[in-house]
């Protein structure tokens, strides 16, 4: 086998093995993370908000540990509302699968008028949370907490 082909094949295999450990993310998650990046600008990224407090990332139970965690709780509740929304009830229009459009300019997020009813609802959920994140202080001690003890 040509060494160049072997190197390409090996690189693809290593990439696939690494990607196998990454859980699939809902389509709207990408829009949400882009919105967060639009509003927070600076050293924090959306990854800093994963596994934060009782509501940011996986979890969603108990009493929020701070203002930022309340932003995530509000976002979770908004998505729960969206799941009950008549225009978001099908698999294709699920809050987690529906893509919407928006613009970001100077930290200002605008949900586009061409979104369907479900997309507009989800866009507003994500927009509200991203703006909330921009105002809430980030407390390093609330990252990767023991949710079994602190989120009752």
UniProtKB/Swiss-Prot annotation:
The lineage of its organism: Eukaryota, Metazoa, Chordata, Craniata, Vertebrata. Disulfide bonds join 38-104, 54-151, 56-72, 71-132, 78-125, 88-118, 111-123. The active site is at residues 75, 126. It catalyses: a 1,2-diacyl-sn-glycero-3-phosphocholine + H2O = a 1-acyl-sn-glycero-3-phosphocholine + a fatty acid + H(+). It comes from the Eukaryota. Residues 20-27 form a propeptide. PLA2 catalyzes the calcium-dependent hydrolysis of the 2-acyl groups in 3-sn-phosphoglycerides. It is an enzyme of class 3 (hydrolase). The keyword Protein transport does not apply. It comes from Bungarus candidus (Malayan krait). Expressed by the venom gland. GO terms for molecular function: calcium ion binding; calcium-dependent phospholipase A2 activity; phospholipid binding. Its cofactor is Ca(2+). This is Acidic phospholipase A2 1. It is found in: Secreted. Transmembrane segments: none annotated.
């Amino acid at each position: 086998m040509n060494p160049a082909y072997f190197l390409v094949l090996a690189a693809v295999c290593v990439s696939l093995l690494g990607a196998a450990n990454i859980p699939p993310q809902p389509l709207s998650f990408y829009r949400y993370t882009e919105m967060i990046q639009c509003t927070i600008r600076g050293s924090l990224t959306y990854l800093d908000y994963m596994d934060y407090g009782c509501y940011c990332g996986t979890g969603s139970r108990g009493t929020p540990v701070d203002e930022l965690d309340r932003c995530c709780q509000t976002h979770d509740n908004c998505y729960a509302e969206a799941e009950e929304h008549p225009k978001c009830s099908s698999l294709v229009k699920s809050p987690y699968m529906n893509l919407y459009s928006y613009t970001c300019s100077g930290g200002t997020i605008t949900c586009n008028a061409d979104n369907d009813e479900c997309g507009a609802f989800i866009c507003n959920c994500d927009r509200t949370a991203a703006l909330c994140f921009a105002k809430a202080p980030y407390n390093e001690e609330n990252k990767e907490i023991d949710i079994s003890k602190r989120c009752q």
